[in-house]
């Protein structure tokens, strides 16, 4: 169905995701996972309800682009069966991811409701994705971002993650196997949840920054395997010219651990210390701490 919105309605759709590339590309979803409506456009004026069928970007001034927006959604993906497929190269995605849930709520300055597994595996394996959208939600739900960008091997940076209210497995494996990722976001949450950061950056071999971790009360599996295989993350037990920055879990204060909370957190990393760190113990790193 084609939607040529009247002027007043059209003006409201200023909140959307933009996919763009200097090269031709297309987007499809084999099994749609959203529970409301999604629309796509090639010019931000003429919107078509989308059922997941393959849509091709349109070229203007040397740039190919597609735009997506939504209404009445509480989830967009929900696991690997519902992931989006991007065919092309050097594809950038910009805008507020929440515009896919409900653009009117975003336009009003609010956060739409997130269901469990809302964006889980959405872009998993999208090796052509170079830039990801903003993720402004401050209150998360179970597995909402799990595996969202897993295997996105062209990503070098990621957006800020401002959430302070976490949920079970919310960031689990979110950026795993993003082999070009160099910079981690800060992680401001002080209250953790079960498996919240488990394997979040595993196998990110280009990662050279580590987030400080302020939470003093750990939860079961919260940090396990978090940096496994990050060969450019380097920790040591003793300070040296190379390992000159203090790194501690928690960042300050006295922490309380939990079942397997720190298991193999630094397994197969590149420093002289690897494996499972101890809580309330100062280590030293050569990396930048964010």
Predicted regions and their residues:
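Enriched but not universal
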Residues: 1-28, 287-290
């Amino acid at each position: 169905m084609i939607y040529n919105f009247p002027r007043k309605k059209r003006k409201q759709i200023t909140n959307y995701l933009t996919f763009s590339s200097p090269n031709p590309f297309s987007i499809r979803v084999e099994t749609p996972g959203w529970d409301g409506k999604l629309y796509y456009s090639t010019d931000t004026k003429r919107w078509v309800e989308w059922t997941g069928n393959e849509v091709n970007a349109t070229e203007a001034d040397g740039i190919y682009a597609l735009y997506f927006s939504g209404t009445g959604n509480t989830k967009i993906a929900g696991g690997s069966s519902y992931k989006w497929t991007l065919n092309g190269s050097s594809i950038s995605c910009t805008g507020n991811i929440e515009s896919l849930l409900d653009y009117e709520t975003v336009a009003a300055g609010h956060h739409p409701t997130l269901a469990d597994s809302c964006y889980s595996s959405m872009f998993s394996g999208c090796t052509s994705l170079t830039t990801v959208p903003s993720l402004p939600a401050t209150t998360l739900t179970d597995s909402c971002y799990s595996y969202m960008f897993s295997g996105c091997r062209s990503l070098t940076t990621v957006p800020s993650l401002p959430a302070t209210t976490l949920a079970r497995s919310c960031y689990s494996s979110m950026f795993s196997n993003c082999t070009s990722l160099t910079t981690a976001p800060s992680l401001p949450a002080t209250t953790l949840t079960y498996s919240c950061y488990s394997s979040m950056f595993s196998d990110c071999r280009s990662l050279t920054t580590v987030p400080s971790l302020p939470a003093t009360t750990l939860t079961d599996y919260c940090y396990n395997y978090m940096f496994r295989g990050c060969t450019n993350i380097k920790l040591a037990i003793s300070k040296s010219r190379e390992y000159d920055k203090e790194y501690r879990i928690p960042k300050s204060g006295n922490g309380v651990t939990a079942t397997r909370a720190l298991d193999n957190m630094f397994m197969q990393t590149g420093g002289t210390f690897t494996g499972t760190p101890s809580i309330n113990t100062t280590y030293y790193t050569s990396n930048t701490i964010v």
